[in-house]
Design a protein with these regions (language model features):
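Phosphate-binding loop that captures ATP/GTP phosphates
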Residues: 1-26, 141
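Conserved Switch II/interswitch segment of TRAFAC-class P-loop GTPases
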Residues: 77-96
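G-domain G4 guanine-recognition motif of GTPases
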Residues: 84-85, 111-123, 142-148, 165
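Conserved C-terminal guanine-recognition region of P-loop GTPase G domains, centered on the G4
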Residues: 91-110
Length: 204
């Protein structure tokens, strides 16, 4: 019965996923606007349970919204990486998330966070050091603004490593993947974009 249940979950998940590479499959959001998608807090529990039972690693790109299912997903996640841009609104939202998740996840280590699109020309920004002071924690990565690299990847439907395997951002993403999957000790990136993380995995 157990074997049949696992095979059933595998078949179910295989029908939902789109294979992108040997080690990457995507579960995409609906592409049509014919109906409204208002999800309840437990709407994705079945899918998440099936993914956890059949996949070695599940990464969820949770949308920038706060409702029942996003709250439930974050609280039950093994690890959380908050992605923020260096402005006041993102600092406020990240601070609120940090404060809530530290309380809601007492037995788990605190969320990680990274800064994205840093260094946009002529845009006032909050410095990474000021971000770190407000959140009482260092970012695990700081990604510089690079419209050509990220624009090419987005328009071609490619990952950063596929566009430029030797780019410093590709190395940063590799180190982030190692951190979040716990597969190896994270080292400081050559470009200096990834902060030292020795001992951070066990930090509460």
């Amino acid at each position: 019965a157990t074997v049949g249940l696992v095979l059933g979950k595998l078949f179910f998940i295989d029908r939902l996923l789109s294979k992108c590479a040997d080690h990457l499959s995507l579960l995409a959001a609906p592409a049509t606007l014919e109906r409204a998608y208002d999800f309840g807090a437990e709407a994705f529990d079945g899918i998440f349970d099936a993914l956890r039972a059949t996949m070695p690693c599940v990464v969820l790109d949770v949308p920038h919204q706060w409702n029942g299912w996003t709250q439930r997903t974050l609280v039950s996640a093994d690890d959380i990486l908050i992605v923020a841009t260096p402005d006041l609104a993102n600092l406020r939202n990240a601070k609120n998330l940090f404060d809530y998740l530290r309380t809601a996840r007492l037995n788990d280590h605190r969320p990680f966070y990274m800064l994205n699109q840093v260094g946009v020309p002529k845009r006032p920004e909050i410095k990474p050091a000021d971000f770190a002071k407000a959140l009482e924690d260092e970012p695990v990565a700081v990604i510089p603004f690079d419209p050509q690299l990220f624009g090419s990847a987005a328009n071609n439907g490619q990952m950063i490593a596929e566009v430029s395997a030797n780019h410093r951002n590709a190395e940063t993403f590799l180190q982030l993947a190692k951190l979040l999957t716990g597969r190896s000790e994270v080292k400081k990136a050559k470009s200096g974009l990834l902060t030292p993380l020795l001992g951070k995995l066990m930090k509460k």
